[in-house]
Amino acid sequence: MGDPIILQADQWWRRPFGMLQTNLREIDADMGVDEVADFIDQHGANAWLIAKNALVDCRKSGDLIHDAITAAHSKGLRLLARMDFSKVSAEIAAKHPEWCFKSPTGKLQTHDGGLVSVCPSGAYYQERIFDILDEVTRRYPVDGFFINWTTMNEQDYYKRYHGVCQCSNCQMRWLKYSGGLELPRGPTDANYTQWLRFSRDIIDELTGRIRSFISQRLPSACLILGKTADIMFHEANNAVGRELWPHTTTEMVSSWMSYRPDVPVLVNSTCFMDMPYRMASEEPAHFAQYLLQCISRGGYPSTYMMGTPGKIPYLCLDIAGQITRFHKKWSQIYDGLRPVAKTGLVLPDRTQMTAEQFEEAVSEYRGLYSAMQELHMPFDTLAQERLSAMAENSGLKRYEVLILPNLGKLGQQDADALDNWVSEGGNLIATASSAVNDYGAVQLKSLPSERQIDVNRERELLFSTYFAPPQSEARAHIYTGPIVPLHGAYHSFEWKADTGGGYKMLARAPFSPPEKAYGNVQMDERGYGIARHGTGTGVVIPFTVGRGYRELGLGVFRDFFTTILQEEGNPRERILCCIAEQVEMTVNANGPKLVVHLINMSGARKQNFGSHIPITGGKIKVLKGGSNISAHALHADKMLDVEDGTILLPTLDLFEVIVIEGF
């Protein structure tokens, strides 16, 4: 039986829950709702997300949603309505072409089934959907809504790029927003980055209106969507041809939880490999990562499948049920779980940089992410676009160290917020181009750099150039390490007076033929600079150290960065974890309890995750706390041995959750 208590709460979604989505096809109109409700209950979920099916002739009642609500509520389940306003029939599109997406070539965007894409700027989204929502909220006491595919439709289901919408509504809105700039046609146009912010604002404003509309009519119903909804949404999925970033789910959940820990985040995890292959089951080991990474950051797990359960053999449903039931069993641990890491790594925002800059910033970010994750240094992901908002809601004050990964020019509000944060005791580490404006001036008073003198991105000019500790015998061709090669980009700065630093450049020298490979002379160019600002510290690493680690994989990049982080940032964490680097560790708290998630990622492959290797010998050292430390392994459901403040971990299979008390 489901959880009857969940049906009694006004804002029921404030407490952890699990969800299962049945994305219905036309052939599913005769679905047995009682059987599906039983399946969802046994899966461990508390909520059912369902789409209305237009083909109701197969049902005696003629009303699938009414039947589903009755079945769900009888089992103690919540029922949420999935709605999609992104497309209309060809007949409606012909009557209202002004509602439709219009490509730069003047074409409409058409789909299978005679459907045509509409634009969120137009009257269908801005006006007509509220008539539809009014009808639904009057007819059905649903417990929530999810609005699917609320985008500007640059790309379709076939992954074909159609460009920026040029409809009359977009033209008028853009004219007012931009002050007369030309509406871009695609990513290569000059105003495209600004258009991304424009389109984000349209979606956020519309989401806020939908949320307000629903809450006035069904006060206990939630909206799952974006920034201005009740529940933040992330779809965890795979894609043909997309490079695997193994940490995508934990990254996205963390970026929302670090911003507003009290606002729920739901991760809808896709059972199939990709939209063009909806009957191809996702690899179970890969699907497990979606749900484990979700709950490790305090998110709500959801399983997304096609059709009626049992009709398509999704191989990942077994592991999905195991993790969903685990989350439900230990709901008292997840209810109130909050981030407590002292370090924040900023996730680059595409709307604040060009496509090329974004690609370089993401490489830098991911290299730094991997460096900290492999050494189990606790950190959260902070979204660049929400930095100033986090300063306003005091979210930045939770952090002792913030890291800016090659972000380039900052918005003025972000720059002011970061300077204030450093002056009040924060420690800021900026790499490469971070906080350098279009004219080379450094935007942050808290950094040791004054202005950028030059930037070198030419690969051949960086060859055979290094940073290393000060050398005493370099002229004799004898070097002391570690020696860190330059890769990606190097920014030469003018440093402020009375600032310090470390490491020195070993200037470029011949590297071929081998008999000529010598002559790297030490120069007075800093490998990093340091300055005090108020009661905090600013650090600049003038080259792409994270990109070097991501693209070359040399441990000297990782060690160089993490040493600076530990010595200059000095985050005062409560624990130290010693375990294989293939384990992802996250740290949260629930009241006085410290909650440590350990996820075995040894099965990572090119496109997905496969079988993992059990990992032994792990330890957690409690750095701050009393003499009565206790540790409970939730998956094994047993108390762990603690010796002189060191917790001896059991063999790590796929995952474990350690609850530490007695601080």
Where are these regions (language model features)?
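N-terminal carbohydrate-binding accessory modules
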Residues: 1-39, 87, 333
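Short, solvent-exposed turn/loop segments enriched in Gly/Ser/Thr/Pro and often Arg
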Residues: 49-54, 83-90, 146-157, 226-229, ...
